[in-house]
Amino acid sequence: MFKAAVSLTGADRKLRAGEYEVPSRASLRSVIILLVEGRVVRHYLTLPEGWSSAQAVDILNRETILTGEVEVPAEGSLWPDTYEISRDETRAAVIARMQRARDRNLARLWALRSPNSVVTSPEEAMILASIVEKETGLASERPRVAAAFSNRLRLGMRLESDPTIVYGITKGRPLGRGIRQSELQRQTA
């Protein structure tokens, strides 16, 4: 009956593929309109600012509508944002979109940098921005922290920033406790 109705109304050439939520007791006519207008179910995934690549993979792995396995990508290679995802889309495809968004945005921001910048590459800028972001949870403090770190780097000093120690210990996952004295002495890469 559905095929006949779609064919008779000419909607067979206008149907749009996708995932739909059809209300219970929907009429045949309203279902056809839904499919022709393409009012598909939309799913979103948010990668918050400041989250590590390992945490991003955790988010992707919790999304049951996605398929496939992914390795944890390089730190700083994913752009934090809200992404629209589709049922049966691969996790690798979502990671690739996050990486393309990072490349586009980093290129745009790199072009706007100060000529006096202490960082010499977009990758260094991303690393420094990540450290600044982890050093303070307050956006209003970030310019001061960034200036202090830039001055230290300009003078050849160490950053001596807790987030660099935590990252060396956890590889991007939360530490969940204070830093131990022994960890302050240990070399981390």
Model region roles, listed by residue range:
Residues 1-170:
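Conserved catalytic or metal-liganding residues and their short signature motifs at active sites
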Residues 168-189:
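C-terminal soluble interaction/assembly domains
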